Amino acid sequence: MPIIKVRENEPFDVALRRFKRSCEKAGILAEIRRREFYEKPTTERKRAKASAIKRLAKKLTRENARRIRMY
């Protein structure tokens, strides 16, 4: 869990903003959303595989676009 130390004479909203930013960087909200409902292991594997395929397609598209620009 992210911990911030409130500095002397620091307004509350500034400290809250720093805390929210550190929570976002740690990925806490995404983890909570992911664990909100039970996901069967098969569904989890299927989702992970689909995201890997999507990542690969995106990478290949970028590389292909880079090659086209070179010529």
From Swiss-Prot:
Alphabetical list of InterPro entries matching this protein: Ribosomal_bS21, Ribosomal_bS21_CS, Ribosomal_bS21_sf
Alphabetical UniProt keywords: Ribonucleoprotein, Ribosomal protein
Pfam families for this protein: Ribosomal_S21
GO annotation, cellular component aspect: ribonucleoprotein complex; ribosome
GO molecular function terms attached to this record: structural constituent of ribosome
Gene3D superfamilies associated with the record: Ribosomal protein S8
Cysteine disulfide partners in this protein: none
Single biological process term from Gene Ontology: translation
PANTHER family per the UniProt record, alphabetical: MITOCHONDRIAL 28S RIBOSOMAL PROTEIN S21 (PTHR21109), SMALL RIBOSOMAL SUBUNIT PROTEIN BS21 (PTHR21109:SF22)
HAMAP family per UniProt: Ribosomal_bS21
Similarity comment: family membership: Belongs to the bacterial ribosomal protein bS21 family.
Protein name: Small ribosomal subunit protein bS21
Organism: Buchnera aphidicola subsp. Schizaphis graminum (strain Sg)
